[in-house]
Amino acid sequence: RGIWHTAEKFRAAGRGSVSVAELVNELTRYFEDKKSFAEWDTPENQLADTLPAISRSNAWVAILNEMVNARRGTSLVSMGVLSFEYRKNDEAVLGFQDAFGLEQGDARALLELLAQDAVYSGAIDAGKDYTLTSAEREYIFFAPTAKKLVLLKTAENAKKSWISGWRGRKRTNGNYYPNSRMSRLMRALGLSEDDADALLCDYWENVFEAETEEFSLDANDFRINIGGLPSSKFYRCKKCGRITPYNVKNQCSSVKCSGVLETYDPLSASEGNHYARLYRSDRADPLYIKEHTAQLAKDQQTAYQEAFVQKKINAL
């Protein structure tokens, strides 16, 4: 909801693209203004000391959660509110376009889909700007351990669920294990498995420029494109209905689907959508609920009752 309203503000100002840091800053201010994460028993004169940090941490959690879950049908990307673009792809587009005879838009979209595959694995963080707690990682990634990418996932680390491999991995018989990035490159460029695997290695070395064996993306290396403006484009698969801002030769962004893309305006189409109505709502005030049982100490019961009468607590 906060990101929706923040994107609306940028849209109204005609801002087609903003940095992740700028969106985090604006979202932090939104949470502060709404006191969305203020504790019910924090004195008014102490809010200025605690609210900015709490609001900023929740802004980062919201952004990272949206990035990792962008494929969901209820995501802000699927509703055309915004999309994500990896800035490190900027310098690779021209060479990629020339090497494979692609249109510039196709080249960019294919590179973006590769970067997004890394994001969807959960190997992303806020870099030096913020460190997620284990509880926050559990909320976003369903695991308390930070997820990482390695160039090749071997049999030795196969049981490490927090590690994802990037390039293709071969079975003992010489055949490759399924790899969605290889499949994507083979379909879009007509490459063999070995050539697709070599291209993934090249991307790892020259775009990710990973300096350590275990690697995670920095969310600050992305820009956010604001939807609903002439510069934003979205597409929908005629077969499966998936919505994407990435169009490679009109192929569905899902490697499991053979559908064809068509131009689509998800932001306008979401007017009657249940989730869109929730996101558009301006109600971002905190809801305080406390358990009121006989097991509580008498002074605690009294404190809750008084707070409820004073409307500091919404429900007992």
Task: Describe the role of every protein-language-model region.
Residues 315-316:
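SF2 helicase motor core recognition
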Residues 1-312:
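Helicase motor interdomain insertion/brace
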